[in-house]
Regions:
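Bacterial N-terminal signal peptides that target proteins for export
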Residues: 1-8
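Bacterial N-terminal signal peptides
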Residues: 8-16
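Subset of outer-membrane beta-barrel
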Residues: 22-295
Length: 295
């Protein structure tokens, strides 16, 4: 019965959100996978990168939200970059698979400053299977119906980069799309609204040897109909091989973060997140694992 109360509460939150606007992917370690939110970042690392994240919310609760993410980024010449992203999200009976391809172009602003322009194109495969809902012999709501739709989308962004700092502006999904279903006069609507992202970060050198850095970064999300969300991220970096720090997400969560460069090609990251929202006070922790390969 206790587990059923958890499931009922989370389902209510999820379906209330779906009735108005679908929230895009939240990544705590956003500085490690910027091209998910900004196509202009594709190729900006000046190397080929394959990164994967697994995010499990409210661990210990069956069928709680999960996210798997894989992205690839590389340069296609002196000024052109390309990336591919695949994001899979599952929340109880709801599944989303968003696949995109990114292209970027680099403009040399000065000797130490690069400006990248990016475009993103792809779509979202959205599925709701109400047959998988366990009702515990309680009559299900007739407004809950199966949905299986594909929604194409496009995005754009700019990324300004110097050795010690960056600025990012992007709208990864520009189209305002609706997923509708009508069964026996009952209409179900879920809306994807454009999200605006703005981010910046700076590397402060803390010692004369130049191997100890403080790396603050800020990410702002805005979507019409929802409060502005801001991630404030601060990492302490030792020789750029070991990083430890934390994140605060306004009115939502705080997290502890750690990144370890196991070799010149392989990075392992971990985030342990706790919600600050009263309605989720009894929910479990959220874990996020990052694997990153550089070539």
């Amino acid at each position: 019965m206790k587990q059923f109360k958890y499931i009922t509460a989370v389902l209510a939150i999820a379906f209330c959100s779906a009735s108005w606007a679908q929230q895009e992917t939240i990544i705590t370690q956003f500085t490690e996978q910027m091209n998910i939110i900004n196509p202009a970042y594709a190729g900006a690392d000046n190397k080929t990168v394959i990164a994967s994240s697994i995010r499990s919310q409210w661990t210990g609760i069956a069928e709680a939200p999960e996210m798997q993410l894989v992205n690839f980024s590389t340069g296609l010449g002196k000024n052109v970059g390309m990336g591919i992203s695949m994001v899979r999200e599952k929340t109880f009976i709801e599944k989303q698979n968003f696949v995109t391809i990114d292209f970027s172009y680099k403009l040399k602003v000065s000797e130490h400053t690069d400006l990248y322009f990016g475009i993103k194109a792809g779509g979202n495969f959205y599925d709701v299977n109400v047959n998988g809902l366990e009702t515990y012999n309680i009559l299900s709501d007739p407004a809950l119906v199966n949905i299986n739709q594909f929604s194409p989308n496009i995005g754009t962004g700019v990324y300004l980069k110097r050795k010690k700092w960056f600025m990012s502006l992007s709208v990864p999904r520009m189209l305002n799309t609706e997923r509708t279903r009508n069964d026996n006069g009952i209409a179900t609507v879920a809306t994807d609204r454009p999200h605006f992202y703005a981010a910046t970060g700076y590397d402060f050198t803390l010692n004369s040897k130049g191997n100890l850095f403080l790396q603050p970064a800020i990410l702002m999300r805005y979507v019409n109909g929802a409060p502005v969300s801001v991630d404030i991220n601060t990492m302490l970096s030792f020789n750029n091989t070991f990083k430890i720090g934390g994140t605060y997400r306004t009115d939502q969560a705080y997290a502890a973060l750690m990144n370890v460069e196991l070799s010149k090609r392989f990075v392992l990251g971990f985030a342990f997140e706790k919600s600050t929202r009263p309605e989720l006070a009894r929910a479990r922790n959220t874990n996020e694992i990052l694997l990153k390969f550089n070539f």
